A protein has these predicted regions:
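Positively charged
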Residues: 1-193
Length: 193
């Protein structure tokens, strides 16, 4: 299976809209079929603790995302959407904190429609429609934004973004200190053995 890696937020591939997906392009990028791409995407998403991931977040030029697959969210419901389009959204909106694998440890309060309808192709190339509500609706809307070139940091004021960045940097620093502490601890335990 092909190994995919998250790319940094300043990479232009993360910040630009993606052309429609084609199976020919899939082969050019070294995947045997859609299922292999889906498997690779879910693997990366779960490795980093995500609940959604688009191809441009791993540097691939595919109009596709995966979402869900965690027991605690919509009973493990998951999607792999190729060439997704939002058909409709509800007037009712919900504000909630969102995170993003492209921006580790950053959480921003975002308002989105409570419900939405997506039209997409599945891994077999069949056209489907999904009526989504709640968390899965939010996840798929967030991933769709990536596909059309919108990053979630664009949906917030500069002040709120600066505050979120500051909190993220504190968390990253704490994680780094924890990692260093564990390395020292591991060396000390090895010495005592």
């Amino acid at each position: 299976m092909k190994e995919l890696k998250l790319i940094p937020p300043n990479d232009p591939r993360v910040q630009s809209a993606i052309a429609p997906f084609t199976d020919e392009l899939l082969k050019e990028e070294g995947f045997k079929d859609r299922q292999e791409l889906v498997d690779c995407m879910f693997l990366v998403m779960k490795k980093f603790g995500g609940i959604g991931l688009t191809c441009n977040q791993v540097g691939l030029p595919f109009n596709m995302f995966v979402a869900g697959g965690h027991e605690g969210i919509e009973k493990g419901m998951s999607f792999a959407m190729f060439n997704p389009m939002i058909v409709s959204v509800s007037k009712e909106k919900i504000r909630m904190k969102e995170g993003c694998l492209t921006y580790p440890f950053m959480f921003i309060d975002i308002e989105r429609p409570q419900k939405c309808v997506f039209k997409f192709e599945d891994k077999d190339g069949n056209t489907k429609e999904a009526h989504l509500d709640g968390m899965m609706s939010r996840i798929c809307q967030h991933e769709y934004d990536h596909i059309v070139g919108i990053n979630f940091i664009e949906n917030v004021s500069k002040l709120k973004l600066d505050m979120a960045k500051k909190k993220a940097m504190k968390q990253i620093k704490r994680m780094e200190e924890y990692r260093k502490f564990n390395q020292v601890l591991d060396k000390n335990q090895a010495w005592q053995s």
